[in-house]
């Protein structure tokens, strides 16, 4: 809380985090049995923000034990009692929203405008599931002869969350809120690149009144995540991240037959038809590619534009992309900050170089950028990039770049573009811009993706389910559907008469 309270006077390049970043048993704890210390960098300056010490096996076990003990109390509470505590947590986040958002910016690199939206989305998620908690119930089924059955919706136990670095606080809330609403306990592991804000969420839940040890945080990388996946007392793992890591999580969790939710990568198509409202389509394409420096799993990075409107579309998109203000993420006029790390920046720039080799044309951006402010000279900035002259077989069109790079491709017919849009192993999101209501719903029905946007893009309301098709994962986050992934159904069969026996 002291770190959060100091945020009003904080500026880019001024914050050093010395607090312990693990949390179990209702308090912050310093790692002792992790292998090595890893530096955590501030994306805007390239400066070391803090040191992350990963948790080892003994510490992960302590966190799980803490969760197990609290689960015995929380799972016995009525839904309305759980709801009151969760609503108080949402209120505290709302109250501290501005300060948490500033710390999120310093750790993650996204702009303050986006971070404020993320923190709002976090408390809204908790508030939503607080409302859902008292409604969770089973079903009564009448059977012949006066017998009957009923179902009980019961929690799973200890749920583990393995988080991504692009939305550290919000994704932590997405994992915790439905789990807690259903009566579970939680142990989550933030990304080693963004370890700072997740622990604040755990503190807030305890301040709000959850049983001590209900929400726990273990820091670390792949080894710590592996310990959670293999732990015999973890009932479920929810993972957000890349496809290769998701496969490993699934494989490790299978050894103890855990419930698994995977929210993985994407290479989402955005289809822009000639009858669209061009202004909205341009706005949608920019939102689909440049939020959070392009580091968003749902990004519509394959922008298919009907040939007749390609010149007008490119002219407007390039003009607006060039006008994007890149710089200090804590300034309200900034629209793009630094990428998460130097390796990520180099990787994205490498994709642009490869695209040029394969014949794509860079219409703007795609280069390292040094803002005028001297304190930002070592930050991980690049200019947002628009590529045209792209083909479906190019690396930039097939692989997830995870940076501010838009690939634009022409198409002629609806049938053709649907076939091309679905020709991918991913299936997280998709979008269509058209004024033809029949086409809009026809295209949405035929796109192979967990989410399809019609005449919009890049919104994820907590009320609606979110998740992927194909290799973008399975399970759902947000919405009522998530209850099915954080609970289990018990069937109880009751005979009111004599037992009908063959013996």
From Swiss-Prot:
InterPro entries in alphabetical order: Ald_DH/histidinol_DH, Ald_DH_C, Ald_DH_CS_CYS, Ald_DH_CS_GLU, Ald_DH_N, Aldehyde_DH_dom
GO cellular component labels: cytosol
Intracellular or extracellular location(s): Cytoplasm, Cytosol
Keyword Oxidoreductase on entry: yes
Pathway recorded for this protein: Amine and polyamine biosynthesis; carnitine biosynthesis
Enzyme Commission designation: 1.2.1.47, 1.2.1.3
Residues annotated to bind NAD(+): 189, 241-245, 400
Domain of life: Eukaryota
Active site: 263, 297
Top-rank EC class of the record's enzyme: oxidoreductase
Site (Transition state stabilizer): 166
Catalytic activity: 4-(trimethylamino)butanal + NAD(+) + H2O = 4-(trimethylamino)butanoate + NADH + 2 H(+); an aldehyde + NAD(+) + H2O = a carboxylate + NADH + 2 H(+)
GO biological process: carnitine biosynthetic process
Keywords assigned by UniProt, alphabetized: Cytoplasm, NAD, Oxidoreductase
Subunit structure: Homotetramer.
PANTHER family on file: ALDEHYDE DEHYDROGENASE-RELATED
Function: Converts gamma-trimethylaminobutyraldehyde into gamma-butyrobetaine with high efficiency (in vitro). Can catalyze the irreversible oxidation of a broad range of aldehydes to the corresponding acids in an NAD-dependent reaction, but with low efficiency.
Family, similarity comment: Belongs to the aldehyde dehydrogenase family.
Record-given protein name: 4-trimethylaminobutyraldehyde dehydrogenase
Species whose genome carries this gene: Gadus morhua subsp. callarias (Baltic cod)
Phylogenetic classification of the source organism: Eukaryota, Metazoa, Chordata, Craniata, Vertebrata
């Amino acid at each position: 809380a002291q770190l959060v309270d100091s945020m009003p006077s904080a500026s880019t390049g001024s914050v050093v985090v010395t607090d312990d970043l693990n949390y179990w048993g209702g308090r912050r704890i310093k790692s002792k049995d992790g292998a090595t210390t890893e530096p955590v960098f501030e994306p805007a300056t390239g400066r070391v923000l803090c040191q992350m010490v990963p948790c080892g096996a003994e510490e992960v076990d302590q966190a799980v034990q803490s969760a197990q003990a609290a689960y015995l109390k929380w799972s016995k509470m009525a839904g309305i009692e759980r709801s009151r505590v969760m609503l108080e947590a949402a209120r505290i986040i709302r109250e501290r929203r501005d300060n948490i958002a500033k710390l999120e910016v310093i750790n993650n690199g996204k702009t303050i405008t986006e971070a404020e939206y993320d923190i709002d989305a976090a408390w809204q998620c908790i508030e939503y599931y607080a409302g859902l908690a008292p409604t969770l119930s089973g079903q009564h089924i009448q059977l012949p002869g006066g017998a009957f059955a009923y179902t009980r919706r019961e929690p799973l136990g200890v749920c583990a969350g393995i988080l991504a670095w692009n939305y550290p606080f919000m994704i932590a809330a997405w994992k915790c809120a439905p789990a807690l609403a259903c009566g579970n306990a939680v142990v989550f592991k933030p990304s080693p690149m963004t370890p700072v804000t997740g622990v604040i969420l755990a503190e807030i839940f305890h301040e709000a009144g959850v049983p001590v040890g209900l929400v726990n945080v273990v820091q670390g990388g792949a080894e710590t995540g592996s310990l959670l996946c293999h732990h015999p007392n973890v009932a479920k793992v929810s993972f957000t991240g890349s496809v290769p890591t998701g496969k490993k999580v699934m494989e490790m969790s299978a050894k103890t037959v855990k419930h698994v939710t995977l929210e993985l990568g994407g290479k989402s198509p955005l289809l822009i038809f000639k009858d669209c409202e061009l202004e909205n389509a341009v706005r949608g394409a920019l939102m689909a590619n440049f939020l959070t420096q392009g580091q968003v799993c749902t990004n519509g990075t394959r922008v298919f534009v009907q040939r007749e409107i390609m010149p007008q579309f490119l002219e407007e998109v390039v003009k607006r992309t060039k006008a994007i203000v890149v710089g200090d993420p804590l300034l309200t006029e900034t629209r793009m900050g630094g990428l998460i790390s130097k390796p990520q920046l180099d990787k994205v720039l490498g994709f642009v170089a490869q695209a040029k080799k394969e014949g794509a044309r860079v219409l703007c951006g795609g280069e390292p950028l040094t803002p005028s402010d001297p304190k930002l000279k070592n930050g991980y900035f690049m200019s947002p990039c628009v590529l045209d002259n792209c083909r479906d077989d190019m690396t930039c069109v097939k692989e997830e770049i995870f940076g501010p790079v838009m690939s634009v491709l022409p198409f002629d017919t609806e049938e053709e573009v649907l076939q091309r849009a679905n020709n991918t192993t991913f299936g997280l999101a998709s979008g269509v811009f058209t004024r033809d209501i029949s086409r809009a719903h026809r295209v949405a029905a035929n796109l192979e993706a967990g989410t399809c946007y019609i005449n919009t893009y890049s919104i994820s309301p907590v009320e609606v389910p979110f998740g992927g098709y194909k290799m973008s994962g399975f399970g759902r986050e947000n919405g009522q559907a998530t209850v099915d992934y954080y609970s289990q159904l018990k069937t109880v069969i009751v005979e009111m008469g004599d037992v009908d026996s063959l013996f």
